[in-house]
Curated annotation (Swiss-Prot):
Residues of the signal peptide: none
Enzyme Commission identifier(s): 2.7.1.24
Name listed for the protein in its UniProt record: Dephospho-CoA kinase
GO process annotations (BP): coenzyme A biosynthetic process
Length: 202
């Protein structure tokens, strides 16, 4: 199997931008946990069938897809329902990510997991790459991007692993603080490093 680089970072750190640059410039395969999480509850999936069985058919939209807004309301009000949902979906997501990583054709793969530290998914990775920004940058970017107030962003930050916790697990770090920072140069340097490591990994 290809060398697996776990890519993570806090909200608005620029994970997607970094992953896209690896893909666009170096044709690196990406397995994205957010996409996998949607796939395991797609119409016709075992995940969606189990959710409907548990919550009832009114958890679906008219098109037969998962009504995420309604599901959020249900689990927000009842912590035991959230625990049930996590116990159902986390193993499914993990299995699907492992299956997808086994299909990788590039010398190494990026496993993009926003909550990699929180869900202890670093066990799936050979190295952990953290996209790092200061908290004030996260606050401003998220408020600008999502039109939310500072209090809401701080609540999200509080629910995530701290910057210190992420950096403590990092093998590599990309600084993504300012718009003019040379992101591509940092990525190019890491790409060369990962290529060399992937040859040793064979």
């Amino acid at each position: 199997m290809a060398l697996v680089i776990g890519l993570t970072g806090g909200i608005a750190s620029g994970k997607t931008t970094v992953a896209n640059l690896f893909q666009q410039h170096f044709a690196i395969d990406i397995v994205d946990a957010d996409i996998v999480a949607r796939q395991v509850v797609a119409p016709g999936s075992a995940g969606l069938a189990a959710i409907v069985d548990h919550f009832g058919a009114d958890i679906l939209t008219c098109e037969g897809e998962l009504d995420r807004g309604q599901l959020r309301q249900r689990i927000f009000a009842h912590s035991e329902e959230k625990q049930w949902l996590n116990a159902l979906l986390h193993p499914m997501i993990r299995r699907k990510m492992i299956e997808d990583l086994a299909q990788v054709s590039s010398p190494y793969a990026l496993l993009v997991v926003p909550l990699l530290v929180e869900n202890q998914l670093q066990t799936l990775c050979d190295r952990v790459l953290v996209v790092d920004v200061e908290e004030k940058t996260q606050l401003q970017r998220t408020m600008d991007r999502d039109s939310v107030d500072e209090q809401q962003v701080r609540a999200i930050l509080k629910a995530q692993a701290s910057r210190h916790e992420r950096l403590a697990l990092a093998d590599d770090v990309i600084k993504n603080e300012s718009k003019d920072q040379d992101l591509l140069q940092q990525i190019t340097d890491l790409h060369q490093k990962y290529l060399a490591m992937s040859k040793q990994n064979r």
